[in-house]
Amino acid sequence: MEVDTMETLIRLFVSILIICVLALMIKKSRCLDNEGVIGSSIMGFILLYFCGFKYLILLLSFFILGVLVSRVGLEKKKAKKMDETCRSLKNVLANGLIPILFAILAIFGFNWALIGYISSIAAATSDTFSSELGILSNEKPRLITTFEVVEKGTDGAITIFGTLAGVLGAFLIGLFGYLLFGDIKIVLCGTAGGIAGNLADSLVGALFERKGILNNEHVNLIATIVGGIIGVLIYCTL
């Protein structure tokens, strides 16, 4: 009994220490505001302490990839006033809440929830890649619902380059998921779920965000839900 208690305390201490170090690094990078750092730290602790290091690594992969693509063509984005290098707690919750819920379900023995976790993160990553890289394209964006030409940055607008970038983002998370958890089906489910979530983001953005019915965080949340569900459904049929 004492050994179990000691192991629990050690795991708790190590988890807190790792999360504090990561929080300081994120704070220094200025990628998140103070509330965002706190929120992401809580999420990170839940994943690390209750789910394990592999779960945390996958979420960190999304964060790191997001930071990298946000800084691609930064000067061009600043000139167009489309840069968003510092994100808030709302962004953290919109992209991380659904993955955390799937991770909690996985703790309780729902094996399919791991796929939902990976696929929902893939959806968030895919959307980030499309948004951050798509605006650098010289193509004229088209609204996903009507394919009419619209201004860059319009909610629900897509480009071929941005869509392909989104496919890459989803695939990378699917690949990382496979490398971490060892099931080759994760690549397909994660990629497909990520793409589906990204397209759902554009569709909901065109139908509701443009009209002011939903905001960007609502749309991102819906994208992760769709991505997670699609990934799970595909996994269950394989």
From Swiss-Prot:
Highest taxon of the lineage: Archaea
Tell me if Transport is a UniProt keyword of this record.
no
Q: Which UniProt keywords apply?
A: Cell membrane, Membrane, Transmembrane, Transmembrane helix
Where does the record place it? Cell membrane
The membrane topology term of the UniProt record is: Multi-pass membrane protein
Q: Pfam families from the entry?
A: DUF92
The UniProt entry's sequence similarity note says:
Belongs to the TMEM19 family.
GO cellular component entries: membrane; plasma membrane
Any transmembrane segments, and where?
A: 6-26, 45-65, 98-118, 160-180, 186-206
* Protein's name in the database: Uncharacterized membrane protein MJ0933
